[in-house]
C-alpha cells in the first residue's frame, strides 16, 4: 500500500515538473516565433487587404491574426512595430487597478507564475508577449521566476511570490475573473484562457499610454 502511494506521489510530482518545464519551453518558442514573424514581415512584405483602424492617434493593423502598432522606444528615437493578440476595441472592459506605471522605470522585472497551477500554454503566451515588449520597448530585462521551488523547472529560477520587498514582478495567474491590479510590489495579471492574454495586452497598452 505504501509503495503504491509512493509511486502515485512520484507520478504526480513528475507530471508537475513536466508542466513547469513545458511552460519555460513555450515561452522560449513563442518569443522566437514572434521575432521570426516580425523579421519576415519586413523581408517579404505581402500585398494583401488588411484590417486597420485608429485609436487615440495610434494606428492598429491586423496582419495574419495579430494586431500591430508602432511604438517609440522609451528614451530614444527608435520606433518598433509591436505585435499584440488583441486591439484596444477588444479590451475596453478590462480596467487597471492601481499605479502600474511605477514599474516602468525598473531595470529588471520578474515574470512569475505558480508551477503547480494549470493552463501553462496561455501563461507562457502571455509571458512571452510581455517579455518581448519589456525588453524591446522599455529596455527592461524580464526575469523568469516561480512562486515556489517545487518542480525541477523551477530549481534554477528565482522564487518570487510577491511577498518580498524589492522584487518588482508581474504575476500571471489563471483565474476566472479577468483583472489587472497592483498589490504589494507586484502587478497581478489574471484571466481564464484567452482572457489572460487579453489582460496582458491591456497592461501593455496602458504602459504604451494608448489606453487609460
Specify the residue positions occupied by each region the protein language model found.
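Hydrophobic membrane-insertion alpha-helices, especially the h-region
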Residues: 24-42
Amino acid at each position: 500500500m505504501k509503495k503504491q502511494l509512493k509511486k502515485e506521489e512520484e507520478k504526480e510530482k513528475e507530471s508537475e515538473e513536466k508542466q513547469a518545464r513545458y511552460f519555460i519551453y513555450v515561452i522560449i518558442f513563442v518569443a522566437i516565433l514572434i521575432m521570426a514573424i516580425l523579421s519576415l514581415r519586413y523581408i517579404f512584405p505581402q500585398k494583401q487587404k488588411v484590417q486597420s483602424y485608429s485609436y487615440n492617434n495610434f494606428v492598429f493593423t491586423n496582419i495574419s491574426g495579430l494586431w500591430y502598432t508602432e511604438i517609440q522606444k522609451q528614451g530614444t528615437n527608435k520606433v518598433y512595430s509591436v505585435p499584440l493578440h488583441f486591439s484596444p476595441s477588444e479590451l475596453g472592459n478590462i480596467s487597471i487597478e492601481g499605479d502600474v506605471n511605477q514599474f516602468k522605470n525598473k531595470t529588471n522585472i520578474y515574470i512569475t507564475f505558480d508551477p503547480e497551477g494549470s493552463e501553462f500554454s496561455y501563461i507562457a503566451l502571455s509571458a512571452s508577449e510581455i517579455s518581448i515588449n519589456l525588453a524591446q520597448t522599455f529596455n527592461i530585462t524580464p526575469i523568469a521566476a516561480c512562486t515556489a521551488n517545487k518542480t525541477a523547472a523551477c530549481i534554477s529560477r528565482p522564487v518570487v511570490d510577491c511577498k518580498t520587498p524589492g522584487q518588482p514582478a508581474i504575476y500571471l495567474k489563471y483565474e476566472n475573473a479577468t483583472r489587472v491590479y497592483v498589490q504589494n510590489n507586484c502587478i497581478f495579471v489574471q484571466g481564464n484562457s484567452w482572457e489572460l492574454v487579453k489582460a496582458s495586452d491591456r497592461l501593455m497598452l496602458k504602459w504604451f499610454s494608448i489606453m487609460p
